[in-house]
């Protein structure tokens, strides 16, 4: 629905947002048109999975299969065809400033198969559009000291996306001074609009019966792997070599009701991550970000 999408993106613009990431699939032409009209930059993301898959019936089933579409080129895999057509379709939209070839890809470990895959996907994009950065959202940098075979994958990219990896940023920045690093997915604070709980505490994955399936709108609830909105933004603000962040998420969505995710008894069906709820009404962190990003 064009009007609903316009309202949603306009609300992000009013909060002070200057860019959005399409997680974890290509955007509709209407979304990109609205973003261009509003002056929002877009990182357009092609895949949430490569050949390893994440669910039994996800795109991983087709990633390396030969493309059978009548417009597919000889020798193209489905991942080649889908990525190429996304870039061809949207390369003339002025809102698009980065292409993403994946999000939290478990098999992107720098071994021969994954290294060949990242090179193949980058080439597919560059053959169509050499003017924009190619990136991906990587969560492996958050484990241990952040090092590993995934660094080889990052070397093939124009911009290196860190998912929840702020704690290892300084070590990796010193190790890779030439990398363009940004937060491809950050925060994952959890909130219920109008519900308030223990403001003096920072609550990590708090899901006891006393919570009544609600998270605190004080901005003090978060997942184990994330940060509060305040801490996430403060890190971004205070590290000049960190090129901004994409917050998880702008609006609530159906599914992933963390911290009650995968608990079959839960009556909750939507996420708590959104800065705006499913009715389109802002939660309190909306005004935190607005106070930092908008001049009034």
Model-derived features: where do they sit?
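Extended substrate-binding grooves/exosites of carbohydrate-active enzymes
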Residues: 1-296
């Amino acid at each position: 629905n064009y009007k609903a999408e316009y309202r949603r993106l306009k609300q992000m613009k009013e909060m002070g947002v200057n860019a959005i990431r399409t997680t974890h699939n290509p955007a509709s032409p209407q979304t990109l048109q609205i973003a261009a009209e509003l002056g929002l930059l877009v990182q357009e993301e092609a895949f949430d999975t490569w050949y390893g898959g994440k669910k039994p019936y996800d795109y991983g089933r087709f990633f390396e299969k030969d493309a059978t579409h009548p417009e597919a080129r000889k020798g193209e895999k489905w991942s080649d065809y889908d990525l190429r057509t996304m870039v061809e379709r949207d390369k003339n939209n002025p809102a698009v400033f980065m292409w993403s070839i994946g999000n939290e890809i478990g098999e992107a470990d720098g071994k021969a198969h994954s290294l060949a895959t990242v090179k193949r996907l980058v080439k597919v994009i560059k053959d169509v559009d050499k003017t924009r950065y190619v990136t991906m959202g990587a969560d492996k940098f958050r484990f241990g000291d952040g090092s590993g075979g995934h660094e080889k994958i990052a070397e093939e990219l124009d911009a290196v996306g860190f998912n929840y990896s702020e704690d290892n940023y300084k070590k990796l920045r010193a190790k890779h001074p030439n990398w363009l690093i940004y937060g491809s997915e950050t925060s994952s604070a959890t909130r219920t609009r109008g519900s308030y709980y223990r403001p003096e505490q920072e609550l990590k994955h708090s899901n006891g019966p006393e919570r009544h399936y609600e998270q605190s709108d004080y901005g003090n609830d978060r997942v184990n792997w994330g940060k509060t909105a305040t801490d996430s933004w403060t890190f971004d603000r205070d590290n000049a070599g960190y090129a901004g962040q994409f917050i998880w998420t702008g609006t609530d969505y159906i599914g992933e009701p963390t911290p009650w995710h995968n608990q079959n008894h839960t009556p909750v069906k939507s996420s708590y991550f959104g800065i705006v709820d499913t009715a389109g009404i802002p939660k309190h962190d909306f005004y935190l970000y607005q106070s930092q990003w908008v001049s009034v």
